[in-house]
Curated annotation (Swiss-Prot):
This is Serine-aspartate repeat-containing protein C. Cell surface-associated calcium-binding protein which plays an important role in adhesion and pathogenesis. Mediates interactions with components of the extracellular matrix such as host NRXN1 to promote bacterial adhesion. Residues 72-83 have a biased composition (Basic and acidic residues). Belongs to the serine-aspartate repeat-containing protein (SDr) family. GO terms for cellular component: extracellular region. Residues 912-927 have a biased composition (Low complexity). It comes from Staphylococcus aureus (strain USA300). Its main location: secreted. It is a peptidoglycan-anchor. It holds the Pfam family SdrG_C_C.
Length: 947
């Protein structure tokens, strides 16, 4: 394969027995930077918090000025404090104030007009009631941005999920699985510095204590710091439990949805408020899976619970339990009820959903007697709904039923609505009731409750005017409202829609949803408005479904996170928007209908492998030969493009190695040189047969790469020199000189026999054994030279002169036998076995010289002058044996031996002749013989000297 590397991206190694290879050891430190995220209790749908403000000049009756009880504070809160609540100098920590607020100003006017216009007028100034609906939320932020895009579980191995086959009915939005109740983690969300404070507050001039005036712009503020354990997961829950006299919200009731946001507006947890239990249950979103070490603080607008805290100038225990941390504080409450007024009204509460005003009016609290009582309500910017039957008239039978909080227990009141006729006029903006109903006089007392709905056609903020026209005075009370800081004006009549659909695995990568393709569970999906503000987030269910509900007409943005191990498929394939993929970010428009076409497809990211082979390059040619074997146990390290080690392995018994599950990208392969081996030559042949060196850069692009090889051979660290010299010199000199002079003057017969036997044997054996055994991976050159010279010179000269002057017969026999045997054996055995990658020179020189000189000279002169017979026998045997053995490896010089044997030096006696002069003749004979022998010896010696 040629996709592996180029000349510019592969690093070769220069062969050198001293090369050192190193592995870069790279550690990834995950910085655990402190994540401090200030969460806030957001107001869903721009929820407004209202504070009712009453500003009046009416004199309070004596029973309204009772001294309140002592203001007591009880704190049962965990003493834990956040370790660091200050801003650091190294980073600018934003302090963001987000106000989802509406200030509702309610102005109440009470006018008393005499029936007789000509009489003296008596004017009573009434108090102005201002209802301020406001929400001020302060954010502080300390964010640790370690792992901003990674979940806390950083295992590279994706979590396995079981995905059920998706239903074919893609428009069946009800198939989306409902969120399951998670684990309660109250013990893992820790609160500290809890406090309940009065915002503004009013000081009682008599007692000097600060009081909560519920109808004079005051609100309560719940504040706390918190930390969240990292073990908290998406779907886990925790709770806020409010006490008997305390609830979230203001004059405007708390929304059922109570989301928690961070400073950037991201949803941390989704809260659901249950007014029955006065508890908010929060469910964590996947935000806690993406961030660690979350901590922060919050400030929440709260209010007195009017149904329970009913009496002015009374201290009530305001208690709250956040998670497992409880805090309480006693606060004096005052609603400003004016019991001397014949007509007074208050906003009992503002409905959070439709923003309707739920009003309560007290009629004839002083219990005056009238002959005329006409109660009229005029609405500006609001309307009555006659079909709702929520205009109620109750007769008061007990003065105590006029509770100060304007939230009477209607179950204890007498409902007399049916006894009166409510006349609606002015397009349901005016309601008139004659409270006399044919009676001539009456001192009856009434509590009237009404609901006024916002009129969407109105351009102003509206007001509610009351009049009580009696025979004595015409009383008026006016409540006006104004919204400030852009509170939500949406009403409950607006229809809500759904948006969402499906995330699936596009196994064939065609960008279209096929029937056999399954959904992907656990994909994060975020919903944003047209301005990029996050509205909601969710996670796909086991079938890959997701859905956002309760949305108004408008343009939205949906963002999909890429699940681990997947790659986004091609977006917007074909013309059918219901079955294509809309990509990672898409825009969805809601126009009077659900939009369930926002899908995203992913396919599993292909994984690739690289590797191959490390071999023993025995012939050092840099090529993989069929006879060459792999090397086991070579350490191979894989690094990514950043130099981080992502894998380490060792070659198997066949020299093979492999790295799997790799994405396309750039990598570096590092081979650690085995001890005692040397890097072979690199890039000598085809890419799948060569050596690539100690470090190799490789790029994988949608393919495997099994061409990354490396070869080594043994280092030349063993030198063997074996020199074997064998010199064998064998010199054999054998000189045998025989001089025989025999002079005989006689008349006898002379027989002279001269036998000369000269045997010269020369044996020269030269054995050279040179054994040089070197076992190593080196190269051995063994030269064994054996020179064996065996020279044998054998000279046998025999001169026999026989002069006989006689009358006798002279027989002279001269026999000369010269045997010269020369045996020269030169055996040279040189065995050199060398297995080595080094050089070994073994020189074995064997020189064997065997010189054998054997000289046998025999001169025999026999002169006989006699009449007698002379027999002269001269036998000369000269034996010269030379044995020369030269063994190389064991140097033993051979000493030549020269042996000359004269076996017949004694002349044979002639036979007796019977002469009387026998003895004399014998003496003469012996003398002649000795003379001949002496002459022979003398002659031989001279000859030798001359030679």
């Amino acid at each position: 394969m040629n996709n592996k590397k180029t000349a510019t991206n592969r690093k070769g190694m220069i062969p050198n027995r001293l090369n050192k290879f190193s592995i870069r050891k790279y550690s990834v430190g995950t910085a655990s930077i402190l994540v401090g995220t200030t969460l806030i209790f957001g107001l869903s749908g721009h929820e407004a918090k209202a504070a009712e403000h009453t500003n009046g000049e009416l004199n309070q009756s004596k029973n309204e000025t009772t001294a309140p009880s002592e203001n007591k504070t009880t704190k049962k809160v965990d003493s834990r404090q956040l370790k660091d609540n200050t801003q650091t100098a190294t980073a600018d920590q934003p302090k963001v104030t987000m106000s989802d607020s509406a200030t509702v100003k309610e102005t109440s006017s009470n006018m008393q007009s005499p029936q007789n216009a000509t009489a003296n007028q008596s004017t009573t100034k009434t108090s102005n009631v201002t209802t301020n609906d406001k929400s001020s939320t302060t954010y502080s932020n300390e964010t640790d941005k370690s792992n901003l895009t990674q979940a806390k579980d950083v295992s590279t191995t994706p979590k396995t999920t079981t995905i059920k086959p998706r239903t074919l009915n893609r428009m069946a939005v009800n198939t989306v699985a409902a969120p399951q109740q998670g684990t309660n983690v109250n013990d893992k969300v820790h609160f500290s510095n809890i406090d309940i404070a009065i915002d503004k507050g009013h000081v009682n001039q008599t007692t000097g204590k600060t009081e909560f005036w519920a109808t004079s712009s005051d609100v309560l503020k719940l504040k706390a710091n918190y930390t969240i354990d990292d073990s908290v997961k998406e779907g886990d829950i925790f709770t806020f439990k409010y006490g008997q006299y305390f609830r979230p919200g203001s004059v405007r009731l708390p929304s059922q949805t109570q989301n928690l946001y961070n400073a950037q507006g991201n949803i941390i947890a989704k809260g659901i408020y249950d007014s029955t239990t006065n508890t908010t249950t929060y469910t964590f979103t996947n935000y806690v899976d993406q961030y660690t070490n979350v901590r922060g603080s919050f400030e929440q607008v709260a209010f007195a619970k009017r149904k329970n805290a009913t009496t002015d100038k009374t201290a009530y225990k305001m208690e709250v339990t956040l998670g497992n941390d409880t805090y309480s504080e006693e606060i004096i409450v005052d609603y400003g009820n004016k019991k001397a007024q014949p007509l007074i009204s208050s906003t009992n509460y503002i409905n959070n959903e439709d923003l309707s005003r739920n009003m309560t009016a007290y009629v004839n609290q002083p219990k005056n007697t009238y002959t005329k009582q006409t109660f009229v309500t005029n609405l500006t910017g609001y309307k009555f709904n006659p079909n709702a039957k929520n205009f109620k008239i109750y007769e008061v039978t007990d003065q105590n039923q006029f509770v100060d909080s304007f939230t009477p227990d209607t179950s204890k009141l007498k409902d007399v609505t049916d006894q009166f006729d409510v006349i609606y006029s002015n397009d349901n903006k005016t309601a008139t009731v004659d409270l006399m109903k044919g009676q001539t006089s009456s001192n009856k007392q009434y509590i009237i409750q009404q609901v006024a709905y916002p009129d969407n056609s109105s351009t102003d903020n509206g007001k509610i005017d009351y009049t009580l026209d009696t025979d004595k005075t015409k009383y008026s009370w006016s409540n006006s409202y104004s919204n400030v800081n852009g509170s939500s004006t949406a009403n409950g009549d607006q229809k809500k829609y759904n948006l969402g659909d499906y995330v699936w695995e596009d196994t064939n990568k065609d960008g279209k949803q096929d029937a056999n393709e399954k959904g992907i569970k656990g994909v994060y999906v975020i919903l944003k408005d047209s301005n990029g503000k996050e509205l909601d987030r969710t996670t796909t269910d086991e079938n890959g479904k997701y859905q956002f509900t309760g949305l108004s007409n408008g343009t939205y943005s949906v963002e999909f996170s890429t699940p681990a191990g997947y790659t986004p498929t091609t977006a917007n394939v074909g013309t059918d928007d219901a079955v294509d993929s809309d990509g990672l970010t898409t825009t969805g428009v809601i126009k009077d209908a659900d939009n369930m076409t926002l899908d995203s497809g992913f396919y599993k990211t292909p994984k690739y492998s690289l590797g191959d082979y490390v071999w023993y390059d025995s012939n050092k040619d840099g090529k993989q030969d069929s006879t060459e074997k792999g090397i086991k146990g070579v350490k191979v390290t894989l690094q990514n493009e950043k130099g981080e080690v992502i894998g380490t392995t060792e070659t198997d018994e066949n020299g093979k190695y492999r790295f799997d599950n790799l994405d396309s990208g750039k990598y570096k392969v590092i081979f650690e040189k085995p001890a005692g081996l040397t890097q072979t030559g690199t890039n000598t042949t085809e890419d799948d047969k060569d050596a690539d060196g100690g470090e190799v850069d490789v790029t994988i692009t949608d393919h495997d790469d099994f061409t990354l090889d490396n070869g080594y051979y043994e280092e030349e660290t063993s030198d063997s020199d074996s020199d074997s010299d064998s010199d064998s010199d064998s010199d054999s000199d054998s000189d045998s000189d025989s001089d025989s002079d025999s002079d005989s003057d006689s008349d006898s017969d002379s027989d002279s026999d001269s036998d000369s036997d000269s045997d010269s044997d020369s044996d020269s054996d030269s054995d050279s054994d040179s054994d040089s055994d070197s076992d190593s991976d080196s190269d051995s050159d063994s030269d064994s030279d054996s020179d064996s010279d065996s020279d044998s010179d054998s000279d046998s000269d025999s001169d026999s002169d026989s002069d006989s002057d006689s009358d006798s017969d002279s027989d002279s026999d001269s026999d000369s036998d010269s045997d010269s045997d020369s045996d020269s054996d030169s055996d040279s055995d040189s065995d050199s076995d060398s297995d080595s990658d080094s050089d070994s020179d073994s020189d074995s020189d064997s020189d064997s010289d065997s010189d054998s000189d054997s000289d046998s000279d025999s001169d025999s002169d026999s002169d006989s002058d006699s009449d007698s017979d002379s027999d002269s026998d001269s036998d000369n045997d000269s034996d010269s044996d030379s044995d020369s053995d030269s063994d190389a490896g064991k140097h033993t010089p051979a000493k030549p031996m020269s042996t000359v044997k004269d076996q017949h030096k004694t002349a044979k006696a002639l036979p007796e002749t019977g002469s009387e002069n026998n003895n004399s003749n014998n003496g003469t004979l012996f003398g002649g013989l000795f003379a001949a022998l002496g002459s022979l010896l003398l002659f031989g010696r001279r000859k030798k000297q001359n030679k």
